[in-house]
Amino acid sequence: MTNDEHVIEALGKTRITIKNGKITDIQEPSIDYCPIFGKYHNIEHITKEDIRKNIEYRIDDFGMCTKNRVLKMDDMLSVGISEILRSNLEQGNIDCVVGACEGVGTVLLTDPDMVQGVGGRVSGLVSTTPIKEIIDGVGIDNVLDSKKATLNPLEGLKMALSRGFKNIAVTVLPSEMIKLLREYPVDDDVNVFILVAHTTKTKKEDVKMLFDNADIITACASKNVIEYAQSVKPYYYGNSVPIYAISEEGKRLLDSRLECIGKPPSVRDYPQDLSKMARKLI
């Protein structure tokens, strides 16, 4: 059997390995409570068994990490990274998303429903291997590396630029990659929007770099991101899992999504009530 292995981080940065459509390893949960999974799955205290059931549900429900992967979906949350991207694609504020999909790696997406399907229900993707059926589903010409399913947002940005896209959103996990993306030279008529997800366990020394370079950052269960936000006071939406709009462009993208769903614009109400957030912040 060909190598088929996908590593994701879910439910508070718990690392999970899936091989040939089956869970082969679940590490210990890093947090006790996630507001999103509390709301949607009634999980008050995260255990390894809860994680197993949730990941098995995703595999069965939409074929996560398998050839049966459903790629187009409706909104999962009212406001998350995928939902923000979906609305702004529909409105023409962005024309391409450099994203990541299991079985595919880095991929260019221009279909709002596919942006939601690819990113809306899959947690942080650490590594993956090619799955032909998923690659065919997103279109092999949109895949950075169909042979290895490589994850490289910077090379994805270069690919988007080579296609002539002008308003490019890039989703990325906390890493030095964020700075490389921001510093990559582009023409004056090109805008690059950087959206950072899965920030739980971000190191204190890395947080300033995130805020200096990103347009939107999700709080997740990150103690350091949330504490830093209290000092620099960016606009945000949400009390339990805030989404911070770091730049003016980030605020425009966030507020565009909020307007689409009839919500008031982002606010700067500080200090935030940490008691409504994940337990514990790490």
Please tell me what each predicted stretch does:
Residues 1-282:
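Conserved mixed alpha/beta catalytic, RNA-binding, or beta-rich assembly cores of soluble enzyme
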